[in-house]
Amino acid sequence: GLLLLPVSQQPLGVFYKKRIFRVLFPFLIWSVLYNLFPWFTGVVGLPKSIIGDFFCYVQGNESQSFSDSLKDIAMIPFNFSFKENHMWYIYLLIGLYLYMPFFSAWIDKADRKMKQTYLWIWVISLFLPYMGEYISHYLYGTATWNEFGTLYYFAGFNGYLLLGHYVKQGNSWSVGKTLLLSALLFAAGYSVTFTGFSAAAHNPAATESDMELFFTFCSPNVLCMTLAVFLALQKVVVSTPALIRSLANITKCGFGIYMVHYFLVGPAFLLIGNFNLQIPLQVPVMAIFIFLCAWGFTALMYRILGRKARWIMG
């Protein structure tokens, strides 16, 4: 939303071709590779357990069967498998690209007050995951036969689209005031996320949904942390040429980094676990290690293939 809204005047097909095709082909290629990986481990004689080491969500259900890989590949047009969990975001991204030209037409005509009203209603919708957990599963007209409740048309990631567009106009606050507000917002969001997740993690009866509730992306605590980063970055000025080049390269490689990184999560967890670091250290060390490896691989692909790498890495 910060970069693309409002969408510039162009035919609908031109926008879709430029945006969707750029993510569609890498998405399909990497989805197939992730789903063929279990079969490949069997071809080269590796034990079946290595699949669970790479992809934790399939532990206990590992299969090196080619037919099982083909079944998962056949499901790509409908949903992701547990071997490429991170692809959930690409299905979402394609949906946002489909929606964006229509949303942009409203943004072009809406005044600041109308955008603010939309954002406030969206903020209210962010409490729905918690209300659904602690008040009632069915809220505001939803039922087994109707999943579209009162706030449905304001809910979801389109709020982040509008938020990005709204905050890119900047603010007149001083650097100190902006950083203080960002710190308070981030601390508030992080404390809710950490406290809720920790409580679920220490509860033997907690379900997978309980574990994930407090880092649901469309929730008020995640919004607080996201907005904090948005506001803080607005005050950052980068003038060092080497850093500018590095950031530009990261931007270029960003989609490829995302495509590749899930192959590295399991091995990185096992590798860094051998160093007996405290958990608060393991997580950032693992994140940095995965990022650098994925960035290096993606940059290498661009160096070898040039512009053709876009079809594979995005």
List the predicted regions and their residue ranges.
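C-terminal "closing" transmembrane helix and its immediate cytosolic amphipathic cap
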Residues: 236-251, 262-314
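Juxtamembrane transmembrane-helix termini
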Residues: 1-19, 30-54, 237, 264
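Juxtamembrane "helix-exit" motif on the non-cytosolic side of transmembrane helices
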Residues: 131-141, 194-207, 268-275
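Aromatic-anchored segments of alpha-helical transmembrane domains
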Residues: 31-32, 121-134, 184-199, 257, ...
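Hydrophobic alpha-helical segments with transmembrane-like composition
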Residues: 5-6, 38-45, 52-137, 147-169, ...
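Hydrophobic cores of alpha-helical transmembrane segments in multi-pass inner/ER membrane proteins
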Residues: 1-2, 92-100, 155-165, 223-233, ...
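Alpha-helical transmembrane segments and terminal signal-anchor/GPI-anchor hydrophobic tails
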Residues: 172-248
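Membrane-interface helix-boundary motifs at transmembrane edges
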Residues: 8-18, 103-115, 167-180, 236-248, ...
